[in-house]
Design a protein with these regions (language model features):
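Noncatalytic alpha-helical scaffolds and linker/capping helices
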Residues: 167, 175-199
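Conserved phosphate/anionic-ligand binding catalytic regions in large, soluble enzymes, centered on
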Residues: 34-47, 51-52, 96-100, 183, ...
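Conserved PLP-binding catalytic core of the aspartate aminotransferase-like
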Residues: 124, 137-166, 184-187
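Conserved PLP phosphate-binding loop immediately N-terminal to the Schiff-base lysine helix
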Residues: 1-36
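Pre-Walker A segment
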Residues: 285-294
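Active-site C-terminal subdomain of aminotransferase-like
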Residues: 32-137, 142-144
Length: 294
């Protein structure tokens, strides 16, 4: 069996794993509109050929450690009626399990395939600009094939580079004393890229976005996507704030919520968390915290 870990946004530009022979595909949907939240929670996914559906384990238990270093087990994946019967299912999935997947789904519906491709192109374009800026210095870029992430072997005075990064309020991922990794996303601005290039090379960068994907893209040309995706009607209808708001309202009208009745069964997340407790989750001090920040 071939198992492939992948990135949903990258797959808008790159061939999907199924087209290159993958049997099982895993990944996270976090970058589809879900804040980093200091590492979670995020909705992961595991997909396989329909012929393997009945061979998948009904439960996957993950082993971890608690704050005291003790072995701890948690339910990482469970198969429910809704995963098998889909729209024919008659039972519900707890909010805490479905909420993050719903958020990622709405993000995909709002942007649609064209919007997601635009976001992916913008992310890759800025990564290419960063690549060119670093390549022109004496640092060595480890990976010449990339979508949004560069691994860089630094040369020169590393302590000076760290100081420039600190002065610019930039944190990057340090693997060791001279090997770093930088990932770009849709929240990264051209100013951020310019500051990164200057901090790493001490060279100012100008005309950052005057760069075409046709000049030197980091994607393998043989791996570019040609097939369509997200062909269902709902991914092509709700691309304005008003349309999206009304669509979500129509869906919510089909459900039982605290604004119209008590919730006698299930949805423990909604029963136990008041609005005043849930509001801070959206604060940038919580939502925008990167899991690797010091």
């Amino acid at each position: 069996l071939l198992i492939c870990a992948t990135d949903l946004l990258a797959l808008t530009l790159m061939k999907p794993p199924g087209e290159i022979g993958a049997d099982i595909v895993i990944g996270s949907s976090q970058r589809f509109g879900v804040p980093m939240g200091f590492g979670g929670p995020h909705a992961a996914f595991m997909a396989t050929h329909e012929s393997f559906q009945r061979s998948m384990p009904g439960r996957i238990i993950g082993a971890s450690k608690d704050v005291s270093g003790n072995l701890a087990y948690r339910l990482a994946l469970q198969t429910r009626e809704q995963h098998i019967r889909r729209e024919k299912a008659t039972s519900n999935i707890c909010t805490s399990q479905a909420l993050l997947a719903v958020m990622a789904g709405f993000f995909a519906i709002y942007h649609g395939p064209k919007g997601l491709i635009g976001i992916a192109n913008d992310v890759h374009k800025k990564t290419c600009v960063l690549f060119n800026g670093i390549e022109a210095s004496n640092h060595k870029i480890v990976n010449n094939i990339f979508f949004d992430t560069l691994s860089i072997r630094l040369n020169g005075d590393v302590s000076e580079i760290k100081k420039r990064l600190l002065d610019a309020n930039i944190n990057i991922n340090w693997f060791d004393e001279d090997l770093v990794s930088i990932s770009i996303d849709e929240a990264t601005t051209s100013r951020d890229v310019a500051d990164l290039i200057f901090a790493l090379t001490k060279k100012p960068s100008s005309d950052l976005l005057d760069y075409s994907l046709d000049k030197k893209a980091g994607l393998n040309k043989k791996m570019l996507r040609t097939s369509s995706f997200m062909k269902q009607e709902r991914f092509h209808k709700y691309h304005s704030e008003t349309e999206m708001m009304r669509y979500i309202k129509r869906l919510s009208d089909k459900d039982i919520a605290l604004d119209r009745s008590m919730i006698p069964l299930g949805s423990c997340t909604m029963k136990l968390n008041s609005a005043s407790e849930m509001a801070p989750v959206s604060w940038p001090e919580f939502a925008n915290m990167h899991p690797y920040c010091p």
